[in-house]
Amino acid sequence: MVLIVQSSGYTLGMTSKPGRRVLPFPDRRAAGRMLAERLTEAVDLDLWSERTVVLGLPRGGVAVAREVAAVLGLPMDVIVTRKIGYPGQPELGVGAIAEGMREPVYDVRLTAQLGLSPADLAEVVAAERAELDRRVRIYRGGSPLPPVAGWCVIVVDDGLATGGTARAALRSLRTAQAAYLVLAAPVAPLSAAESLQAEADQVVIVATPSRFSSVGEWYLAFGQLTDADVLALLD
């Protein structure tokens, strides 16, 4: 497994090259173009010929994926995931689900610390699965993911905080027999990027700031996207 990053010491306003500002990213589009440049350097796309696809994680990751796909000249789709939150405290993620997989992927250490069993989370999982199915119907008319067996798949998000939803997406795609998995994001804490090396063949991150509290802090413009926004990006 290969982890490719610019630096683990970026702070706001630092540059990767003389005169070039890296953080904060102006917006998701600019971050996507930067990420595409990094992917061009890091991944041997010629090896896969026409068997490469970019999959964005909704919603914000789709805006980044759109730029990556446009710059690299690749097809794009989405892979829908949902965070499994602690009951009554949904912002605390204890796992995630992704389309194409039957069971959630849990943060085993955290669920053990909290004393949670799958039965404790059954209601939350059911609600998130219903929302996942709703989004698949909206984004892809209810059709399943296109076949990825034997393909190189580049999974793109707008940033990784814990990496829980990305982990679920990667496991789903591995089960679907994707031949080569690349996880790509503009920004992530180094700990999250390293924790996902076992799930992907390559992890490509533009910047891994040493101080990290949220993805949004590393963007000047980080508005929430709607389902309509995602559909427009997929059009």
Located regions from the model:
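PRPP-associated nucleotide enzymes
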Residues: 1-235
